[in-house]
């Protein structure tokens, strides 16, 4: 067989391999699908994969779509030592997801005429004063909501908090007269202190404690009867134990905390209770519709914040994808709430570990929900073609073995002087062309999740793909580059005449 024929035969094999994989993955009928047991299994697989990767002891996860609960389930343990499993009733510290309650309460008080968003903070918090470049500056309630007050994110230290000043009323004493990072209203800077001050304003305007007002005005009407606010490190029956990682091992953690951070960080709740909150946010009663919509409106631009265009009243927003969301992190807990009012669904992940895998999990679940019809159809189709993928795996494995045998034989021939290297411009061009074709096909393979499923994340796709498809993909990729090696050996070597 001539070199030219061998070259085109090898290229044909590569193209046919790539096309066969593309055909198997892209076969997609017009059959309408809905969320089925297979979809539930896919979601469970995604969740368990991310929790395992993040070494998260326990989590409770809620998905609400079109006013109905699709998923409300616990995974792992709320208490590892006692083997108490996480459940929808497990209570977690939700950290900064407390801010949305505080923001909504402020907007409600403004709607009732009990305060104005353009009021100076000092109007409701007597003697409040902060400086910029040595000059006293006026900060408004709206600037606190928008995180544009200029108050630094690191303005207080845990070391400065004692049992004597660890109350919401003491928050102003900790920062009184301190220097702002920038002039109020000019720049976004995320700071818990903004929402702590809003909590104090709520307290002063309503003449009742912040926690009592939130409970009576929002929690009870929404039937969030098991939601509370952290007061001590004592854990009741349904409270999750918080953990921190030591290496890859979660260990019990009970960090110190500030009571004055209650309005910004220390609500304790469950997915069972948050079901009511999510439904309220997505489909509020008529009397609250304008209020909820206002709480989702952009107040400030958040340049530099990942995946966010702006900050609203206790929420980040992404206008491009119509998302309203917020993460919450403490030393030993993390949470993430995502809303898509346009498509009418919400996702909640509560975990008893501070982990970067919590927002990753929400991203994966969001992708799954947005594309669930496509995923369900593709997954169903792939399951029907498992035998064919097994055949592909066998063929690709055979091709890899043949390529290995040929390469080893060529190496043996070279060692014994039976092979000579040849060089020419034509061979160089063909070599570069072969390499470019292989790279192009590899890039197409890499882009398949985005082209077919709307996700550019292979790690996400691989969590729910059947093992037969995974093996077919892996062996195909190896076969692709094995074939390239064979092509290059054909082009650059020739058998010596004896």
From Swiss-Prot:
> Membrane-crossing residues?
6-26, 389-409, 433-453, 471-491
Keyword annotations for this protein, in alphabetical order, are: Cell membrane, Membrane, Transmembrane, Transmembrane helix
Q: List the disulfide bonds.
A: none
Q: Which Gene3D superfamilies match?
A: DD-peptidase/beta-lactamase superfamily
**Which is a Gene Ontology cellular component entry for this protein?**
plasma membrane
SUPFAM superfamilies in alphabetical order? beta-lactamase/transpeptidase-like (SSF56601)
Superkingdom of origin: Bacteria
Is Transmembrane given among the entry's keywords? yes
Pfam families noted in UniProt: Beta-lactamase
User: In what way does this protein cross or attach to the membrane?
Assistant: Multi-pass membrane protein
UniProt keyword annotation of Acyltransferase present: no
Q: Where is this protein localized, as stated in its record?
A: Cell membrane
What biological function has been recorded for the protein in this entry?
A: Its precise function is unknown. Has no penicillin-binding activity and is not involved in methicillin resistance.
Tell me what else is known.
Answer: Has two of three conserved motifs typically found in penicillin-binding proteins (PBPs) and beta-lactamases, but no penicillin-binding activity has been detected.
State the name under which the record lists this protein.
Protein flp
| Gene name as annotated | flp
């Amino acid at each position: 067989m001539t070199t030219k024929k061998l070259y085109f035969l090898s290229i044909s094999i590569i193209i046919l391999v790539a096309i066969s994989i593309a055909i198997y993955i892209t076969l997609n009928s017009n059959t309408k699908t809905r969320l089925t047991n297979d979809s539930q299994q896919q979601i469970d697989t995604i969740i368990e994969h991310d929790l395992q990767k993040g070494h998260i002891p326990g989590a409770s996860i809620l998905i609400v779509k079109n006013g109905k609960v699709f998923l409300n389930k616990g995974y792992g343990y709320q208490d590892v030592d006692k083997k108490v499993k996480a459940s929808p009733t497990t209570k977690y510290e939700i950290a900064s997801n407390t801010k949305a309650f505080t923001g909504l309460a402020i907007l409600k008080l403004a709607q009732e005429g009990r305060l104005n968003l353009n009021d100076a903070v000092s109007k409701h918090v007597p003697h409040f004063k902060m400086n910029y470049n040595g000059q006293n500056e006026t900060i408004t309630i709206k600037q606190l909501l928008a995180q544009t007050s200029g108050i630094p994110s690191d303005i207080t230290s845990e070391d400065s908090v004692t049992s004597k000043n660890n109350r919401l009323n003491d928050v102003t004493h900790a920062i009184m007269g301190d220097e702002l990072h920038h002039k109020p209203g000019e720049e976004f800077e995320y700071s818990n202190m903004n929402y702590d001050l809003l909590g104090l304003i709520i307290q002063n305007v309503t003449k009742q404690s912040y926690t009592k007002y939130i409970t009576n005005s929002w929690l009870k009407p929404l039937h969030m009867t098991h939601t509370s606010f952290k007061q001590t490190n004592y854990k009741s029956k349904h409270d999750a134990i918080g953990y921190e990682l030591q290496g890859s091992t979660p260990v019990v953690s009970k960090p110190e905390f500030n009571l004055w951070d209650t309005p910004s960080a220390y609500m304790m709740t469950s997915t069972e209770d948050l079901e009511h909150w999510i439904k309220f946010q997505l489909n509020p009663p008529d009397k609250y519709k304008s209020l909820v919509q206002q709480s989702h409106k952009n107040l400030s631009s958040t340049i530099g914040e990942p995946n966010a265009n702006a900050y609203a009243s206790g929420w980040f927003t992404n206008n491009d994808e119509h998302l309203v969301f917020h993460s919450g992190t403490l030393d030993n807990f993390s949470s993430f709430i995502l809303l898509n009012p346009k498509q009418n669904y919400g996702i909640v992940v509560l975990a008893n570990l501070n982990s970067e895998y919590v927002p990753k999990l929400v991203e994966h679940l969001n992708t799954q929900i947005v594309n669930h019809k496509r995923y369900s159809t593709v997954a169903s189709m792939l399951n029907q073609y498992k035998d064919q993928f097994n055949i592909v795996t066998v063929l690709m494995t055979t091709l890899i073995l043949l390529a290995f045998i040929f390469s080893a034989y060529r190496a043996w021939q070279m060692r014994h002087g039976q092979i000579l290297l040849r060089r020419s411009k034509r061979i160089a061009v063909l070599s570069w062309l072969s390499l470019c074709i292989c790279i192009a096909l590899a890039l197409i393979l890499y882009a398949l999740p985005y082209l077919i499923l709307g996700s550019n994340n292979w790690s996400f796709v691989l969590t729910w793909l059947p093992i037969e498809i995974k093996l077919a993909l892996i062996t195909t990729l190896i076969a692709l580059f094995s074939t390239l090696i064979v092509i290059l050996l054909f082009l650059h070597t020739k058998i010596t005449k004896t």
